[in-house]
């Protein structure tokens, strides 16, 4: 990497950080509940990776809200290069648990939401991999939404491991232009 490329990259990173740090500061008071607490920040700090679940099903309204929250994530040039696959079929969940080395907890989960990159919607050229960032932001929104609803969830990486991508693609019959980035298994937390 030459000096001009490094400078361009650092300038972009610095600009992004500066915008993040100064943007939205004027309305901080509107983000607080009447108690004076910033519930968004508290939700971020409360979120944990949960790997023990109850078998209690999740209501369709909650699943829809989780996906809507994921879709509210920012994306480069508003491309929204994602697809979400909600899996609640026990046989498919068990296959995912059997096929993926770090997803054994899926055997307990009542559902999984698979976050995929849709390459037909992705940017072209040197920004052709921004879909990964966009899908990661969507995944974090999904995890935070699950936390706010009292659901436990964990994300399990699939991409960039080609063997995992192939296994998920096979189990879910995904077309070639859809790449599974990761999936989450939201569920009511096992508190016992």
Where are these regions (language model features)?
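Solvent-exposed coil/turn segments that connect beta secondary-structure elements
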Residues: 89-90, 118, 159
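Small-aliphatic-rich amphipathic alpha-helix that forms the alpha element of a beta-alpha
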Residues: 66, 70-71, 113, 126-170
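N-terminal amphipathic, basic helical "cap/leader" segment at the start of enzyme domains
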Residues: 25-111
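Conserved small/polar residues in nucleotide/adenosyl-binding loops
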Residues: 184-192
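Bacterial N-terminal signal peptides that target proteins for export
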Residues: 2-11
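Conserved hydrophobic/aromatic beta-strand scaffold that supports enzyme active sites
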Residues: 43, 112-116, 182
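A glycine-rich helix N-cap at a beta->alpha junction
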Residues: 172-185
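Bacterial N-terminal signal peptides
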Residues: 12-20
